[in-house]
Design a protein with these regions (language model features):
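Catalytic cores of soluble, metal-dependent hydrolases
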Residues: 2-67, 73, 191, 203, ...
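Metal-dependent C-N hydrolase catalytic cores
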Residues: 3, 10-18, 22-256, 260
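Well-ordered, non-membrane alpha-helical segments in soluble/globular domains
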Residues: 98-108, 381-388, 531
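Intrinsically disordered, low-complexity regions enriched in proline, serine, glycine
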Residues: 120-122, 164, 232, 299-301, ...
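Conserved alpha-helical scaffold segments that buttress catalytic/binding sites
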Residues: 206, 210, 221-373, 377-382, ...
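Proline-centered loop/turn at the N-terminus of a beta-strand
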Residues: 219, 262, 287, 399-401, ...
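A structural signal for the main folded, soluble domain(s) of proteins
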Residues: 511-516, 521
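Short beta-strand element of the alpha/beta-hydrolase
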Residues: 522-529
Length: 531
């Protein structure tokens, strides 16, 4: 087992009972966790801020960060803790592995290590290396247990207490509870270490987001579990206990009110992040955009039992001051791939995000839409994940925190995560041709545009243009405008004004009509209206 002198705690092939504490102090010391000596561990954001404020000889770690800040070059952060693997199913049924498998995070870290993204030598050597080349390796961000106060920024105290109580149940009770919960919409298993792992997952997300928001790293990847985006404010569901990303967003907004006011959460997990949506549904300062399979509410998480609670359909745009801050790109079926996701980014995600102009971007990075994931049934490739990440890095001054959500094929999740991490570290995304987009997906994007048009200038007709699908397909917008042109021509002799700029011609074709005498009349009447 790698000791705390390594740049991050690295997974190796041995029993989960040997999971280290990662050299990080924590609030709760559950039985069965071994204590490891502390080495030269990286500092938390609170440690760094405190040391930065002290005039007397800050540590070598802080000096290295200050040097990298002055040079304008910061490393990419990586948060990981082996103890999160201790969350395991208490129901030892005939199925060998539950989809939300502890090996998910281990495989990602092994992939990072094999690819040379993680430094495996002493921290003292890493400091010297990063002083010379800050982007060569990922900077270790230690995970810690989230506090009850932090978790209750988005959850009820009653829900926190319910999760905490899991650590006091007997194995028999946990097994019975798992058998009851692991079905239907609840879809949750529990174990003796679920509470501790959930605290670390939430705390790891918080520290990742804070390090990015504070400028200690340029961006970061939190390799954490259990995931969070299905957890509601008062209940656990969908493999999720605490909703990590909203907790991280709220803590950053509270601790950095001047520099982290607006947060953009992009969720590319194949399942709708119902919990994230509901926590920010009326919040004007958090933009939540989700790309997910909806399938008329038949795909998980489906429709809530309470019809008053919004689901993942594309007409759910937010409420009150939060209208327009909830964007659901709800695919009609599985089978979506690179073409659909890149089109969604180019036509919907990025235009709205740029208009929102966030201070921090958090990616709820589920990789179950990846090619090879049996549960997701979609075909998004690692190069596509790299391109989507690269586009998001153009926002918020590059402050992007990637937090793991779902993804259940070990090979697909590790390769997809590697593509994202390499992009965060500055490697250009691989060249890709724009794949074709299905007619069904094009219709969804057009409907999303229409649903969001009242709230975003970039979504209004003429500003955004959904591409044609195939040589024999026409946009409904073009058909309607062509008919309007014919009527105006027959009744008033009007004809279209030629637009010379090629970039504008397609979007505004047949939209600017004039009468033949426009150049000879002294008075001109302009009529401007929606199509």
């Amino acid at each position: 087992m790698a000791s705390s002198t390594n740049s991050t705690v690295e997974p190796e092939d041995h029993a989960m009972a040997d999971a280290p504490t990662n050299g990080v102090g924590h609030n709760h010391h559950p039985a069965g966790l071994r204590e490891y000596r502390e080495g030269v561990a990286p500092l938390s954001t609170d440690d760094i801020d405190a040391a930065m404020d002290e005039a007397e000889s800050p540590s070598e770690t802080v000096e290295a960060l200050k040097l990298m800040r002055r040079r304008g070059m910061l490393p990419t952060g990586c948060c990981y803790d082996d103890r999160m693997k201790l969350h395991a199913n208490a129901d030892f049924g005939p199925t060998p592995h539950h989809p939300e498998d502890p090996r998910r995070i281990e495989e990602i870290m092994k992939m990072f290590k094999r690819a040379g993204l993680i430094f495996t030598g002493p921290d003292t050597e890493l400091l010297d290396i990063l002083k010379e080349n800050p982007t060569k390796y990922m900077w270790r961000i230690p995970a810690r247990e989230a506090t009850k106060q932090e978790i209750c920024t988005v959850h009820t105290p009653g829900h926190y207490d319910w999760v905490e109580n899991l650590s006091h149940l007997s194995t028999r009770d946990l097994r019975a509870l798992s058998m009851t919960l692991d079905q239907g919409r609840a879809s949750l298993y529990v174990g003796g270490m679920s509470y501790e792992a959930a605290l670390l997952s939430a705390g790891g997300c918080i520290e990742t987001c804070k390090n990015v928001a504070a400028g200690n790293v340029k961006n970061a990847f939190a390799v954490i579990r259990p995931p969070g985006h299905h957890a509601e404010y008062d209940s656990a569901m969908g493999f999720c206990f605490f909703n990590n990303v909203p907790i991280g967003a709220r803590v950053c907004q509270q601790e950095y009110p001047e520099t982290c006011r607006k947060v953009f959460i992009l969720d590319w997990d194949v399942h709708h992040g119902n919990g994230v949506q509901n926590m920010f549904y009326d919040d004007p300062n958090v933009l939540y955009t989700s790309l997910h399979v909806y399938a008329n509410g038949e795909f998980y998480p489906g429709k809530p039992d309470n019809p008053m609670i919004p689901d993942g359909d594309l007409d759910k745009v937010g409420d009150g001051p939060g209208k327009g801050k909830n964007v659901n790109i709800a695919w009609p079926s599985q089978g979506m791939g690179d073409g659909e996701y890149l089109a969604a980014f180019q036509k919907i995600v990025m235009p709205i995000a740029k208009e929102f102009n966030p201070d921090l971007v958090i990616i709820s990075a589920g990789f179950d839409a990846a090619d090879g994931d049996e549960l997701g049934g979609c075909f998004v490739t690692p190069p596509c994940y790299a391109h989507m990440t690269h586009m998001l890095m153009s926002l918020a001054g590059g402050k992007v925190a990637v937090c793991l959500e779902g993804g259940y094929n070990l090979q697909a999740i590790s390769h997809s995560a590697l593509a994202v991490a390499r992009t965060l570290m500055g490697e250009p995304p691989p060249k890709m041709d724009m794949p074709p987009i299905s007619k069904e997906a094009a219709r969804v994007l057009a409907r999303v545009q229409a649903a969001q048009a009242p709230y975003w200038e970039c979504m209004r007709p003429g500003i955004i243009d959904i591409q044609r699908v195939g040589n024999d397909a026409s946009r409904l917008h073009d058909v309607i405008r062509g008919y309007q042109r014919q009527v105006l021509s027959e009744k008033h002799g009007m004809f279209p004004l030629f637009i010379q700029r090629e970039a504008l011609f397609r979007s505004f074709e047949n939209q600017v009509l004039i009468t033949p005498d426009v150049q000879t009349k002294q008075k001109i009447l302009f009529i401007i209206h929606d199509p």
